[in-house]
């Protein structure tokens, strides 16, 4: 467990963490902004993120971005599900699949691993399988001394993302905590008061999910600022960053909010 403590301390060495998620292709295909991983990672890697989140396969394409002492840490995705797939084929009951092992992640250079916990499939057997896989992965992560991140989500077929109703977010957050997550990647519930309730039921630090792209950058930054004030320890952001016109500048702005407690106005100045 000493290894896990060391890696956790590095990720949160500034008290909070900015993680950039680039693993969407495993679920949603080549989304706008990450069609070319080499280009987008080059724009983002040196502009403030504490870690980049991707599959072990993507690491092969962008490995040079992790070579230096000042490089971001690497978080690798181990699994996938189809419950967010809308463009190509809407799912029936939904599936969950384990793709990589913790050993695969470590071989790729990972400093932490991340998995889904999806509640609300049309088939209880799939949900049970998801839980059993997480149990095995948690044990493997503990054996190797690498932080185990869980992304707990409540899904319904009529919602293309995930349900952010506070009681349901609290439920999946506590479920992931009881499984043994070292870090939780959780939906923001819309306001500080309700999100404090989520923070209070968690056993581990919470990073909010960036979620689908917001209408404006200011809207995203305000959500982030509110979440931090409620007790979140950072963010894992994807579409709201790499679908922006200038992701390099926005990465700097987000980092300033997280690490320097900058207000929205200060952060927006970086984008001008």
Swiss-Prot record:
It comes from Saccharolobus solfataricus (strain ATCC 35092 / DSM 1617 / JCM 11322 / P2). The active site is at 185 (schiff-base intermediate with substrate). One of its GO terms (molecular function) is fructose-bisphosphate aldolase activity. Belongs to the DeoC/FbaB aldolase family. Coiled coil: none annotated. InterPro entries: Aldolase_TIM, DeoC/FbaB/LacD_aldolase, DeoC/FbaB_aldolase, FbaB-like. This is Uncharacterized aldolase SSO3226. Keywords: Lyase, Schiff base. Its EC number is 4.2.1.-.
């Amino acid at each position: 467990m000493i290894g896990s403590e060391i890696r956790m301390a590095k990720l949160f060495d500034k008290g909070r963490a900015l993680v950039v998620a680039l693993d969407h292709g495993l679920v949603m295909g080549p989304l706008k902004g990450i069609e070319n991983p080499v280009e987008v990672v080059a724009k983002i890697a040196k502009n403030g993120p504490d870690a980049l989140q991707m599959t072990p396969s993507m690491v092969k394409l962008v490995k040079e971005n992790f070579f230096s002492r000042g490089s971001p840490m690497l978080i690798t995705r181990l699994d996938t599900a189809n419950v967010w797939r809308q463009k190509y084929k809407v799912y029936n009951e939904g599936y969950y699949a384990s793709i990589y092992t913790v050993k695969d992640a470590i071989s790729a250079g990972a400093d932490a691993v991340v998995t889904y916990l999806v509640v609300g499939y049309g088939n209880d057997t799939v949900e049970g399988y998801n839980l059993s896989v997480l149990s095995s992965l948690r044990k493997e992560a503990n054996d190797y001394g690498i932080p185990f991140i869980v992304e707990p989500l409540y899904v319904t077929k009529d919602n293309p993302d995930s349900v952010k109703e506070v009681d349901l977010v609290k439920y999946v957050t506590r479920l992931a905590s009881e499984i043994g997550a070292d870090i939780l990647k959780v939906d923001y519930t819309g306001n500080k008061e309700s999100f404090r309730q989520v923070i209070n039921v968690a056993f581990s630090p919470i990073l909010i999910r960036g979620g689908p792209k917001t209408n404006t950058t200011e809207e995203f930054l305000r959500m982030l600022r509110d979440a931090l004030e409620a007790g979140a320890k950072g963010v894992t952001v994807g579409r709201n960053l790499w679908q922006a016109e200038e992701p390099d500048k926005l990465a700097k702005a987000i980092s300033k909010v997280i690490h320097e407690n900058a207000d929205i106005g200060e952060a927006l100045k970086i984008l001008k």
